[in-house]
Every structure is written in C-alpha cells, then in structure tokens.
C-alpha cells in the first residue's frame, strides 16, 4: 500500500488527497472517516483548483526548472484540471466538471455513441473550455504541454508511445497529428 511504501522509505509525512468523487459525494465525509478507521490514513478533501495546482507542482518537479512555461492537462473521471506556469507554483490552476466518466454518463446513452451524441458532446466541451483556454493562454504560449492521467497515457499508447511497463523514465510523446 502507499502507507507501507511511505513507512518503508522513512517518509516524514503522508499526504493523501481525495478528489472529485469525494468532493461531490453526498456521503463524502463518511467515506473519509471510514478510510481513516480502516487504514489509519487521513484523506484531505481538496478543491478542484487545489488538485490542479498540486498536479502542476509535481509536473514542474518532474520536468525540471528549465522546461519553460508548462501547460498541464489532467482528465479524471469527474473533472478536468488545467494549469500553467513557469515556476514552482502555477500562474493559473483550475478545474471544470468535464471528467471522462461524467461526460460518458451525461452524453452517451448507447455504445458506441451515435454521431449526433458525439457532436453534441464536442460542442458542449468546446463551450466549457473556451474561457479556460483564454485564461491560460493569457499567460503566454507554453514551451511544453503535459498530460497527466490514465486518459492521456491510454491516448499516447494508442498513438504508439511506449507501454506503461517500460517504466517512468521512458520519454513518451503524442502529437496533435497523431489524434486525427
């Protein structure tokens, strides 16, 4: 478990966060208490914007200070986090309720989805992302765009990137043209 790993590696603190699913659950507080009772780990519920900022910080540390302006995307099940910056903390970090699971449930009532459903979803996502994109791009063009989620890992794999089993230090790239 993450707790055992932290103990074995002499971590001074274990910081565990609960994201979109807990933020929106009617019984979120009960779930947090249950996890603490069963595991001894205290989860902290964080806002979507905090989630975006924490993810940005991890990306910045991984990519290094010389990476220039980073634009980070993180698609979860319930939310989509965006962040950008040139330093340890982001210039902007925000979250919108556009997670993959949420959108699938709300827009697709058949599998595979019909062209009409897909078109409706695309229109909706573009409308929701437009103000976010304007705010992020106001800080300047990114030197690097990073995707940090299983959704992006799966897309990169489909586009020919190395599999997850190749390890974390294998460079994986995906280009816009790969997605067309």
Please annotate each region the language model reported.
Residues 1-11, 15, 19-69, 84-180:
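Helical "lid/coupling" subdomains associated with nucleotide-phosphate turnover
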Residues 71-79, 83:
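A generic, well-ordered mixed alpha/beta core segment in the N-terminal half of proteins
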């Amino acid at each position: 478990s993450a707790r055992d790993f932290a103990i074995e590696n002499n971590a001074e603190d274990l910081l565990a966060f609960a994201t979109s699913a807990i933020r929106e659950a009617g019984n979120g507080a009960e779930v947090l208490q249950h996890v603490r009772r069963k595991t001894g780990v205290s989860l902290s519920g964080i806002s979507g914007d905090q989630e975006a900022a924490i993810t940005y910080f991890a990306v910045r540390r991984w990519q290094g200070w010389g990476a220039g302006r980073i634009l980070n995307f993180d698609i979860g099940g319930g939310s989509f986090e965006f962040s950008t910056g040139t330093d340890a903390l982001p210039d902007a970090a925000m979250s919108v309720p556009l997670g993959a699971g949420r959108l699938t449930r709300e827009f697709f009532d058949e599998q595979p989805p019909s062209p009409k459903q897909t078109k409706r979803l695309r229109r909706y996502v573009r409308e929701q992302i437009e103000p976010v994109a304007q705010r992020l791009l106001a800080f300047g063009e990114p030197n690097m765009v990073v995707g940090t989620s299983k959704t992006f890992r799966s897309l990169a794999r489909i586009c020919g990137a190395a599999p997850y089993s190749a390890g974390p230090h294998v460079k994986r790239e995906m280009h816009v043209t790969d997605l067309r």
